[in-house]
């Protein structure tokens, strides 16, 4: 099964334990498995590796852009929705090791979990094969997103888009519900779910309520097949 994932990213691991670590959600150990490993440390590294590769690509290929524009484009390319989109492209959720509770709650298709796992996977490639190897993987997986961002065609107002889709389906009214606030006051993460009636369409998180609502709407659009 892991071989199939390696084929998806066009990279074969020399150290399979790195790949397994990248695929292990923290809930796996929390539910009594005899393993303390999770992908959280790799996720930390992968965030920086991805940022470096995309920064380098933009710097070398868009000499017309000033620092502010470079930062803006990079943020669009490496954001959670983009990472989750790449994860779905390679069916990453189906390979994750996670606790039953997390799986039952829809963890395999949750943007935040997919994005974190994607960063962990990139870090694993970096540690296993070096910068050139992970550069190839990133630029291949993110090619469509990079092109769309640079052409200005990425649709980032997901709430408006979801509203349009739901209205056309005539299935009811959308509501957004703040379900959790994580962390201290100076560094809060907000978790929001978007619903039609009692049916949860998507869950998202962000550093503001608005950002978490956009993330929830984006996940809903992905599940509805509007975003791929």
From Swiss-Prot:
| Annotated positions binding Mg(2+) | 43, 116, 119
Can you quote a single GO CC term?
cytoplasm
The cofactor named in the record is:
Mg(2+)
Per UniProt, which keywords does this protein have?
Cytoplasm, Endonuclease, Hydrolase, Magnesium, Metal-binding, mRNA processing, Nuclease, RNA-binding, rRNA processing, rRNA-binding, tRNA processing
Q: What enzyme class is recorded for this protein? A: hydrolase
Among Pfam families, the record links this protein to: dsrm, Ribonucleas_3_3
SMART domains the record matches: DSRM, RIBOc
Reaction catalyzed: Endonucleolytic cleavage to 5'-phosphomonoester
- Kinase among the record's keywords? no
Main localization (coarse): cytoplasm
Instruction: List the Gene Ontology MF annotations in alphabetical order.
Output: double-stranded RNA binding; metal ion binding; ribonuclease III activity; rRNA binding
Q: Which CDD domains match?
A: DSRM_RNAse_III_family, RIBOc
- Name all DRBM domain ranges: 157-226
Q: Where in the cell is it found?
A: Cytoplasm
- Active site location: 47, 119
Protein's GO biological process: mRNA processing; regulation of gene expression; rRNA processing; tRNA processing
Function summary = Digests double-stranded RNA. Involved in the processing of primary rRNA transcript to yield the immediate precursors to the large and small rRNAs (23S and 16S). Processes some mRNAs, and tRNAs when they are encoded in the rRNA operon. Processes pre-crRNA and tracrRNA of type II CRISPR loci if present in the organism.
Q: How does it assemble?
A: Homodimer.
Instruction: Report the family membership.
Output: Belongs to the ribonuclease III family.
Kindly give the NCBIfam families that the UniProt entry links to this protein: RNaseIII
Kindly provide the name given to this protein in its UniProt entry: Ribonuclease 3
């Amino acid at each position: 099964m892991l071989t199939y994932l390696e084929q998806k990213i066009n990279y074969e691991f020399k150290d399979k334990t790195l790949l397994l670590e990248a695929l292990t959600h923290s809930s796996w150990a929390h539910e009594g498995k005899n393993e303390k490993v999770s992908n959280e440390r790799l996720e930390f590294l992968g965030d920086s590796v991805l940022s470096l590769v995309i920064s380098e690509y933009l710097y070398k290929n868009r000499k017309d852009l000033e620092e502010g524009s470079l930062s803006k484009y990079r943020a669009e390319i490496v954001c959670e929705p983009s990472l989750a989109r790449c994860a779905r492209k390679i069916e990453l959720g189906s390979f994750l090791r996670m606790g039953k509770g997390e799986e039952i709650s829809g963890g395999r298709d949750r943007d935040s979990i997919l994005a974190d796992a994607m960063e962990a996977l990139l870090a694993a490639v970096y540690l296993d094969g070096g910068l050139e190897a992970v550069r190839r993987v990133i630029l291949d997986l993110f090619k469509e997103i990079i092109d769309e961002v640079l052409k200005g065609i990425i649709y980032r107002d997901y709430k408006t888009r979801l509203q349009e889709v739901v209205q056309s389906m005539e299935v009811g009214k959308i509501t957004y519900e703040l379900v959790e606030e994580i962390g201290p006051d100076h560094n809060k993460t907000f978790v929001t779910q978007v619903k039609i009636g009692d049916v949860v369409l998507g869950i998202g998180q962000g550093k503001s309520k608005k950002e978490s609502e956009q993330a929830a709407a984006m996940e809903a659009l992905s599940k509805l097949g509007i975003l791929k």
